[in-house]
């Protein structure tokens, strides 16, 4: 007994056997004494004195209590001290025991000296230790914090079976060491006194006596002082052995802090002393120990008694346990990490010591001894299963023994025992279960460590944190984790079988435990989460059985052990866990985590032990209600613990003990039904199983589940009540739930049950306190919640269960309370009944149920719990059999080496053009072979299927189909009908889900409808919104629908209301009246002539009439100020809806910009709320509400127009746009007359698309079809219907292209084609190309047209569409060329274009073009001017660009007309652009050089631009430069000259193709602004060239130098030497021929000049003259603005032939050039330019460059075209480009520029046509001259001499 006595002294279970009466009136006394002692010792007494006094007090109050306290102290001392320290601890404990009980005299005899020494040694610490023990349930439990002998006895029985005394000592020391540090920390922190006091007040029932705490403190202090390192066995062993897990203070009051927990711990021990059977639960509840019930029988405190005891206990057990447990766990972890293990005892020694101690304690209670033996046998056989069986056999005894000892003492002892060695102090049955888990491990310390480590760490952490939590972990953890894991795969059968046997006898015991189990079961989830692997096992409920068994073993030698059998229903779950609870090691791992994150341990404690403790300690009402019946049913359920573990969870869960199919009979669901708390006690593990491991139990309980619903309804209701309250607890234990979702979630509810029911009265506050205290204990992780749980369910069991369920539970840890809800899910239950379903259910049911139906869950709470146990049934997961993988026949061609194994086949889906979807799924053909059971699969390609996207995703079309594209007025009716249908749809559909995301979705929805209505009105009135009474009335009805009825009345007498108001007007007159002094002051000021002073005097006296009259004569600023003051003081202060009127007055006063301030003050826009102290309405309402007055303001302004009101509307629109009111802002912009439509990249743009916010939303908003079509309707109204000759929204073409692409993607190809044709027509019709008409747009149109053309099958609904397709296929560029070039050139260009048509590629059309024609286009590509030499190859290149070919081919024609298009396309292509450059460069060289000369890009940039089309963003700028350059060209001849030089070189290529005329044309082109029309126009430089060429005779010389310059420039501009060479060569050739032709032309002209008559004959003589003559006529006809000036050729050669103008121009006469500019009508001009394909082509090229430059500016645009971004970029780049280009083309080029973009290709086409006869162009240009002359006549060439 020496050692055993010592063990008994420090171990609650052992001490109870030492003779301390388990019945403990002592608990109350101890509580009081501990309180007193705490207060005194902490404040006044020295540690030794405190210990002694407390011991005395305890002994005086009750021998059992005194013994309990002594035992606790002694226990704490040995545990914490090293092998050396145990002596002191034993002495102290013996002293205390002697003082307390004669029954412990032997131990006391040894103890007194040691106790004195210890107290002396730790003079200040004893009391602290006592406090620490109280605060740290683990220590108390481990060291016998419970003074009750009964509890000690229970522990000895259990301990005898499981750990040897040596092991026990080792464990004690470990935990003591940890506890010492923890206690010391507690003491140091100053919690000792408070904790002792609190413990004495609230929790002495659990811990028995503050003296124990003192002893513990002394011991720990000594340990601190000792130099020798403290040996700490692994946390698991130490917790199991020491019983740290048994410390279940948290159960009593989760709220109370660690100090409170200490006092609760003391109370717990007192309760154990009072009654082993019921005392445990009573102690848990912290009820006053039943001093009068010393008998060991099962008699337990009534629920009211338990609740009463809980009143005191709830505070400390939880909180103290939390903080202390955390500290203690930390100490244990630190000690373990430091390997500071001073214990001399080996694992075997520890086991021996435990057994000895247990045996010592057992002597007092033979039942406990028997139970211990039984536990050992059971553990040896099947751990939890046997334990459950034995418990089932002895549940009554255990219960009886519990009653025998004071409830407080016995129960305390049980808890202490559980917490120290067994893991769950919550219920005696559970402690036994833990010992059972423990017992199998007793054989070796390693075994103990496996089970205990999981538990011990928890116990160490939880014990200190919440002694209850660790105990649950050790016992259930080891065995359950192992048993469950092992059995999970094997199946629940063995566990179920054992539980069946065990369950029946255990039913009575289970009754309490089921109650505890439910709360307890919930806690396990957290731990399970900490140990995710166990969860699968945990579901099996194996974990619960150990917990129940552990509790009985520890708590009550007999009765508790019998109750433990009741927990065996949890042992069912535990059978797996304990029997196979190998996870105990895992648990060990988890316990540390739990100890670190107390929440997990608390959850576990709740699961396994919390039910009983809660019943008695935390939730007295629940315990009382649940204990009797639930013990039996759950005992039965737990009896089959291993197999029935699932059932146990269900039963424990609440109403369905039945889930354990093995225990249908044992299931007496009535007990579980009615008292979930008892099921917690008996089946604490099952409830945990239910929550954490419930899935696994579900599999076993599948059959039972059907029954559970019946039982579940009562339990469910109870659980609802208890669980919901625990919502707080569950939340507090959220970490626990996090540890294991399912179990935790369930546990929180059981805890809540216990808390709500048993704690409802006493702990109800504690529950809330627990919630609040939880933060305090949060350090312990969720101990506040878990503490209540631990007491009810063995923490180890809970931990084990949690670990088992961890995988299932951990995922949704946050759902801990919902876990209960998830448990509530009945449907899950049915599913979880089958293992396989359980496997799946856990994951799904737990999270989904908890989340999906928490409300409904409440009703089926218990069923859900049972379902949860089932859900976690990872066993079922094991049951699931994965489908057998197919065995494929690998190929032999090397594909088998593919790491992706694509040879096995995979589905292929491809989305194609026009909304087509191609799919191919592989076919798996089985191949059977002899000797093969299964066939091998041969994968072969499947059928290729083509679907239409509309088949899968049908397009939602309105009743009325959009009539677009809107080309003419005939579409008006259809458009109005479509708009009306859309408006009706918006009104009927309501707000879309996407729109609802906006904070003001309803307002924006109304504003959207208003915007559409206004556009419809605009269409109805042909683009007019004002100036007509009818229009104004229509708009007024739209904006103010409410005025429709009042308007007629107003018409007849609008003033009538005003007259009716006249009577009130008298009041205003009265208010306006003032005293004579005010008037006198104003009069005096006026007499002096100080009108301004008079004004402000009137304002100060509120004489507004006087003030305004006088101010009207002063400066307007004074008038504005007076009105502003009037508005502020009179208008806005009168009514709440005066913002709009105030704004109108401000507008009248001229304060346009400030008018919006009346709607939303600047302070509000800045984010401030200004409050007026004077008494305005400002503070009474939201300042931003003024935005809602925008409609009133707009109506007032429109009805009362003023000179500058449009500015006010613009400001209003900006204000609305800044607040995201896009539709309202756009309405204001439309009426402001200053709305800026443009691309998204233009910062000045107000509207890109109506109804689309391009400033605050992503650009993909610009792809909205509704916005595009609405904007198209607006454009249609203001252009077509209004009679505007041109489109007002050039940027909209890009969006129309996007819409066309969208139509094509949806399979509506015919409509898409119509849009393409419309875009092409718009581009052709545009006289002033816009920067938005960049190459990206052109390329996109050409590409889409080519795609549509290629899909001939669906090209159109009828053959009619095909012709249009052919035209498109002929090429967009061909059309442009034909349109721009004019019919003269059209013939040639079309010919070439048709030839190009023959070729499908874009370059196919270039095929016909000779390099010369190409060169002009190239010249347009100034950058490529170097390739001019390549111009000949250029034609090749144009073809060479076949890469871009299909689209570019058409563009090549355009290139012919304008190489710029080519470049644009290439740019759109990007890389092809570069290629095209190569081909085009030859043709472009001149142009490029010219272009270089052209300021457009700074020629090099232009070249670079083309090379870098991606610079779309820059394009606008470059184009701007280009455009400006064209303008500058005329302005800046030199730059133009540079470009002209380029042109000249360009002309030489033209000469090659056309001969001299080309040169002249090129020269002429510059001369005439028409030439500028194309690149020439763009490069007004042509004028400079014209200047160079000015002397027609000298033209050769001039041109030659020009060519040289050009070549040089080309070289300089074009870095490519090859290009320079080519350009130089081409220029040289061209120059030579030009010189010759110019000379001839000069001679002809001279002759013509000399002949006053027409020189047609002369012209005929020389092809030049004839050609020019025709041109002259043409020019005369075309150039009406200014005819060419006749010049005497005899004089200086002031004339030069302007190729663009196709006439001779007098240098000296600027009008001639200007006239030529004015001469060309856009088309004609283009035609002449085309006729001078070279010259015009260069302009086109230059334009192309401009376009290119723009495309570069919109370089991003090309992609954006393909993608949504394109439109913005397209739109964006153009603005600047458009400006520049328009400028360049503005002179004569306006039309040509468009042509330049498109017509230039025609010019190349002409050149191409000529190109077909390159020889003619070069060698025999005369013939060409004829043609070109004709063209020139038509186009621009005027024979100056002819006139």
From Swiss-Prot:
CDD domains: ACE1-Sec16-like. Residues 29-40, 58-76, 92-108, 183-198, 396-448, 579-589, 615-627, 691-702, 749-759, 863-872, 1408-1418, 1441-1453, 1480-1491 have a biased composition (Polar residues). Residues 1-220, 269-324, 339-769, 807-872, 1385-1691, 1706-1843 are annotated as: Disordered. InterPro entries: Sec16_CCD, Sec16_N, Sec16_Sec23-bd. Residues 309-323, 644-656, 760-769, 826-842, 1457-1468, 1726-1742, 1751-1764 have a biased composition (Low complexity). It is a peripheral membrane protein. Residues 521-549, 594-614, 657-687, 1765-1776, 1790-1804 have a biased composition (Pro residues). It comes from the Eukaryota. GO terms for biological process: autophagy; Golgi organization; intracellular transport; protein localization to endoplasmic reticulum exit site; protein transport; vesicle-mediated transport. Keywords: Autophagy, Endoplasmic reticulum, ER-Golgi transport, Membrane, Protein transport, Transport. This is COPII coat assembly protein sec16. Belongs to the SEC16 family. The gene is sec16. One of its GO terms (cellular component) is endoplasmic reticulum membrane. Residues 165-177, 362-372, 479-492, 1631-1655 have a biased composition (Basic and acidic residues). Involved in the initiation of assembly of the COPII coat required for the formation of transport vesicles from the endoplasmic reticulum (ER) and the selection of cargo molecules. Also involved in autophagy. Pfam families: Sec16 (PF12932), Sec16_N (PF12935), TPR_Sec16 (PF12931).
